[in-house]
């Protein structure tokens, strides 16, 4: 639940206010409130994005329609275990085995042989978003490829290789310690971390990272960094939660971070929705500018929002 240290969380406080009556009047409306944790990937969005919701129906309407709420929070994943919760719980729109992946979302942008356009057809044709979004451009907007130095690209390729080999990127942190101290203990830790690494080491775009173990260790030492939060996407899995800063997510096969359009695909924005403003900004400008990556990362996924809105409409109509 939402409580922490035996105190009500802000969500619980809001829930209690809604249930007891909003406002100071004796006639203030009361609500039947359902606590929810809904994951966007259960509603046709190719992204692991669990979020907490409070869905409330005015009590007098709920009583007429026999609508009730569960006493505990309902998770959208519960549905796959046969728990449908209460009438206020939005049922997932996709089977667990059919949860969409990174490749479903952006495969057409980097794989010429990709013919799986089902998700794109839903986004761009069947979603009905075109009824409310005006768009005249034919070319794909917001798809400017990110520029990186050769060293950063080399590090990205190593991240991709490590992900494929099941090697933790924390080895870079160990390498930083060795570079700073020359302590052989750290060198042996690197050797241990790479003991099962397959060589020659190749990146997904067929670049040779290292021809043998010694060269692989040298490459790790060359690219050492204390930052190991960056990770490549896995093409066969949903995207991790899209956030407003793009630096930590690496393309599954190319040596770069993601474009605004690719992140927007993960969020289920149709291709004809164009993001304005600068791509990124920083410092004091963040107070006045909302860059494109922030617009994408802070949004509720449109397909998920549509499901919830339709569910509420069905409840009260």
Can you annotate each of these PLM segments?
Residues 122-317:
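C-terminal target-recognition/interaction regions appended to catalytic cores
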Residues 1-214:
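Class I S-adenosyl-L-methionine
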């Amino acid at each position: 639940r939402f409580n922490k240290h035996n105190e009500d969380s802000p969500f619980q406080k809001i829930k209690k206010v809604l249930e007891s009556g909003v406002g100071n009047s004796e006639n203030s409306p009361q609500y039947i409130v359902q606590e929810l944790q809904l994951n966007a990937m259960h509603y046709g969005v190719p992204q692991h994005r669990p979020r907490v919701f409070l869905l409330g129906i005015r009590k007098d309407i709920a009583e007429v329609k026999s609508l009730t709420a569960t006493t505990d929070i309902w998770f959208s994943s519960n549905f796959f275990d046969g728990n449908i919760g209460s009438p206020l719980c939005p049922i997932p729109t996709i089977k667990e085995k059919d949860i969409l992946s990174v490749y479903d979302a952006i495969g057409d942008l980097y794989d010429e042989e990709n013919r799986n356009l089902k998700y794109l057809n839903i986004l761009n044709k069947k979603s009905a978003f075109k009824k409310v979004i005006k768009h005249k451009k034919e070319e794909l907007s917001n798809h400017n490829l990110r520029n990186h130095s050769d060293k950063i690209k080399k590090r990205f390729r190593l991240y991709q290789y490590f992900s494929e080999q099941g090697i933790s990127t924390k080895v870079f942190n160990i390498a930083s310690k060795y570079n700073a101290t020359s302590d052989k203990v750290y060198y042996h830790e690197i050797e241990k971390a790479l003991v099962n690494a397959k060589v020659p080491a190749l990146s997904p775009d067929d670049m040779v990272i290292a021809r043998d173990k010694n060269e692989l260790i040298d490459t790790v030492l060359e690219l050492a960094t204390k930052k190991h939060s960056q990770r490549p996407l896995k093409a066969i899995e949903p995207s991790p939660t899209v956030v407003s800063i793009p630096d930590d997510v690496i393309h599954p096969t190319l040596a770069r971070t993601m474009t605004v359009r690719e992140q927007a695909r993960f969020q289920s924005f149709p291709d004809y929705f164009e993001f304005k403003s600068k791509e990124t900004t920083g410092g004091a400008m963040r107070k006045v500018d909302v860059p494109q990556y922030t617009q994408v990362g802070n949004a509720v996924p449109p397909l998920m929002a549509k499901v919830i809105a339709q569910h509420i409409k069905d409840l009260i109509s």
